[in-house]
Amino acid sequence: MRASQIFIPTLKETPAEAELVSHQLLLRGGFIRRLASGLYTWMPLGLRVLRKVERVVREEMDRSGAQELLMPVVQPAELWQESGRWEQYGPELLRLRDRHDREFCLGPTHEEVISDLARREIHSYRQLPVNFYQIQTKFRDEIRPRFGLMRGREFIMKDAYSFHMDHSSLEITYQAMYEAYQRVFTRLGLSFRAVEADNGAIGGKRSHEFHVLADSGEDAIVSCHHCDYAANMEKAASRPDLAETEIPLAAERVRTPGIRTVAEQAEHLGIPTAKIVKTVLVVADGKTVMLLLRGDDELNLVKAGHALNAQDVQMARPEEAISATGAPLGFIGPKEPLLSIPILADHRALGVANFSTGANAADLHWINLNWDRDLPRPAAADLRNVRAGDACPHCAEGTLSIRRGIEVGHVFQLGERYSESMGITVLDETGRDATVTMGCYGIGVSRVVAAAVEQHFDDRGIIWPVALAPFEVGIVAINARKSPDVAAAAQALHDRLEAEGYSVLLDDRDERPGVQFATMDLVGLPHRIVVSDTVLAQGVWEYRARRTTENVLLDETQLMERLRKEHARG
């Protein structure tokens, strides 16, 4: 294709609203354009990239045995009310009414719709297992859409849903989809990691997330350097520390005027933060609960929700703290609270000896408290965020490291979460009704495009992996409008490369060479070939791989061999 025949509206300046590199470069390169907050138009160049992602995803879904269908984006409210998610999903669910005053929503996901389809159409165990998928537009009414395609309100997603007679059948499909996802992201040329994950609002049992590794990623990815353990921060655990063994000191209440934070407490008392048991007051499903952590640890609200079996866990407000304990925040502790409040401690907090904690009165703290002697041990659970250097929970030798990642895929074992609430039953081999078990599997197709840019760029622009590039080869024809020889040679090379199976963009624009080179670098085509009177006079082509800054002169045989070699690298 000729550059003069395709619309590529590049920008010299970075738009002010673009924060992430992917947002900046996709706008500057003419791949997308903003319509409204969180809404983007895919321009011709961007759509070529998007279609490449879709093609790879579709091929691997078909290879795994999943069957493609297409469901409505507008969904009736009664399905969501039936599953219990109409209220649970919150304001991110865009709700609307039709002219008959019936309630609907724009689908952020399709568990309810596919469940309704299954209960209408699947009646016998002979029809199972079955796995359906679609590639379709979704909508989530994000409160603050930002980062371009990374967190928009409208996005394109591949979502798949499988139905089974039992868990062993689900496990087989789950593994097949897990492996299909690995193939998808490998084929797309992305560096990624699959990690154990929490199921969140989707519900269900086992799940894994797939993260593209990038410094700009919103998510913390925890992994062991010695074994294959990996999890996201919400799920990650560490091997418990051994309890401290010290001679108990005399407990004492001391004045700590105005000392509210752990750091202030440690400095005032002359102790490390690890010698403090801090109290975090939360409201779990409307009930006040006291959570205890070691002073140098951070509360993981997702873990707390699971430990408390609560759907909603919020930090207590100052007035709630005083009402429940008689003390302001910063001075609350587990010893003799004003009211009988449920207490749950993190495992590490129960391993601290001679610790300091709030005394449930303003400007007072305890020091040298010890479990069992001064106060009873409360129930314990894993409540903390792991930290780099923690011991791996799966092996004896490993320690944990933390990297940043961008979530681009998620696979869930839903179990009976939706089949029970929506009554999906089939006749089993004995002729009795049996509840099916489900899995669901998502890939953020449009998000993959942005994530790829976050991983593949330099100060000149995007560096697309071959599998994602809108064109694989860019030919820069210098002064083609003035030199018939350059125009003819560039066109002949274009035709030869396309005959070899490459997708080629021939830059035949009447622009200065510097502008042509800058455009090629910005849009990130993997291979650049320069055709000019100078190189033609030498009987060679000037070649550069986008990932390098090295220009090399090659004859046609060498050029074809170099392209094949570089192309194979991705």
From Swiss-Prot:
Similarity comment text for this entry: Belongs to the class-II aminoacyl-tRNA synthetase family. ProS type 1 subfamily.
One annotated Gene Ontology cellular component of this protein: cytosol
Domain of life: Bacteria
EC number from the UniProt entry: 6.1.1.15
An example molecular function term from Gene Ontology annotations: aminoacyl-tRNA deacylase activity
Name of the protein in its database record: Proline--tRNA ligase
Assembly and oligomerization: Homodimer.
Keywords for the protein's UniProt record, in alphabetical order: Aminoacyl-tRNA synthetase, ATP-binding, Cytoplasm, Ligase, Nucleotide-binding, Protein biosynthesis
Protein's organism: Acidithiobacillus ferrooxidans (strain ATCC 23270 / DSM 14882 / CIP 104768 / NCIMB 8455)
PROSITE patterns: AA_TRNA_LIGASE_II
Purpose of the protein: Catalyzes the attachment of proline to tRNA(Pro) in a two-step reaction: proline is first activated by ATP to form Pro-AMP and then transferred to the acceptor end of tRNA(Pro). As ProRS can inadvertently accommodate and process non-cognate amino acids such as alanine and cysteine, to avoid such errors it has two additional distinct editing activities against alanine. One activity is designated as 'pretransfer' editing and involves the tRNA(Pro)-independent hydrolysis of activated Ala-AMP.
Compartments it resides in: Cytoplasm
Catalytic activity reported: tRNA(Pro) + L-proline + ATP = L-prolyl-tRNA(Pro) + AMP + diphosphate
CDD domains the UniProt entry points to: ProRS-INS (cd04334), ProRS_anticodon_short (cd00861), ProRS_core_prok (cd00779)
Any single biological process term in GO: prolyl-tRNA aminoacylation
Enzyme type, top EC level: ligase
Entry remark concerning the domains of this protein: Consists of three domains: the N-terminal catalytic domain, the editing domain and the C-terminal anticodon-binding domain.
Family matches, as Gene3D superfamilies: Anticodon-binding domain, Bira Bifunctional Protein, Domain 2, YbaK/aminoacyl-tRNA synthetase-associated domain
